[in-house]
């Protein structure tokens, strides 16, 4: 009888912890990181009435969690620093992105935060694709997600400007895309791929930019 009770108690504990582990291990299938240049957190509340009733901003406010006291003390407040600091959780002195551009005393010239002369443009013949995250010294949320899932996760960065797509996505991103304003197409670099995926090429072929300019 005593052994039977121990067995039942052991099985009960196993089922309890197993159920708890299953609930903890439930993960979202999609995580979206969004940065809006020069948008302070209080704008979400100030302009709440102007957001679409079923739009994304109201959904985030009504169903999300607001970290209003979060602060990363860094300077200068350029976008390269901002993207890197938010997605690495570190400051420029640690992540290496000290501005959109800075003076490199070893190269004796000004360098751009995402420049990389060892890679080539994919998607156009311009030099605007010679970019990568190699100047960034820290890992990003995307990099840590890759490690945590044994590189089964897919991480993609997309932005109008190259630094906005490249730096947040991190070193191990599957892809990063940005806009080439010399040809009106979305491009990448061979740091990520040898050629654009079919869906990007198809989107470029629509020349949607011609509708606005």
PLM segments and residue spans:
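Soluble non-cytosolic domains of exported or imported proteins
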Residues: 26, 38, 47-51, 77, ...
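Stable alpha-helical elements in mature extracytoplasmic
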Residues: 35, 40, 53-57, 82-83, ...
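Bacterial Sec-dependent N-terminal signal peptides
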Residues: 1-26
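Short, structured active-site-proximal loop/turn typified by the sulfatase FGly-forming signature C/S-X-P-X-R
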Residues: 44-94, 154-158
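Beta-strand elements within well-structured catalytic alpha/beta cores of enzymes
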Residues: 28-40, 60, 86, 145
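His/Asp/Glu-rich, glycine-adjacent segments
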Residues: 91, 96-213
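Extracytoplasmic/secreted cell-surface and envelope-processing proteins
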Residues: 41-45, 79, 165-169
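Acidic/histidine-rich, surface-exposed loop or edge segments in extracytoplasmic proteins
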Residues: 32-43, 121-127
């Amino acid at each position: 009888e005593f052994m039977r009770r121990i067995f039942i108690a052991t099985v009960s504990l196993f089922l309890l912890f197993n159920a708890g582990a299953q609930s903890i291990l439930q993960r979202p299938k999609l995580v979206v990181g969004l940065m809006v240049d020069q948008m302070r957190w209080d704008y979400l509340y100030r302009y709440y009435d102007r957001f679409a009733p079923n739009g994304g901003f109201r959904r985030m406010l009504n169903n999300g969690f607001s970290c209003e006291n979060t602060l990363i003390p860094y300077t200068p407040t350029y976008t390269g620093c901002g993207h890197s600091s938010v997605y690495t959780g570190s400051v420029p002195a640690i992540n290496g992105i000290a501005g959109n551009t800075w003076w490199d005393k070893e190269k004796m010239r000004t360098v751009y935060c995402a420049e990389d002369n060892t890679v080539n443009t994919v998607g156009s013949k311009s030099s605007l694709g010679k970019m990568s995250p190699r100047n960034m010294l820290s890992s990003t949320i995307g990099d840590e997600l890759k490690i945590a899932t044994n590189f089964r996760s897919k991480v993609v960065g997309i932005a109008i400007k190259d630094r906005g797509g490249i730096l947040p996505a991190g070193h191990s991103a599957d892809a990063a895309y940005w806009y080439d304003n010399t040809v009106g197409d979305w491009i990448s670099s061979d740091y990520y791929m040898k050629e654009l995926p079919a869906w990007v090429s198809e989107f470029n072929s629509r020349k949607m930019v011609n509708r606005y300019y």
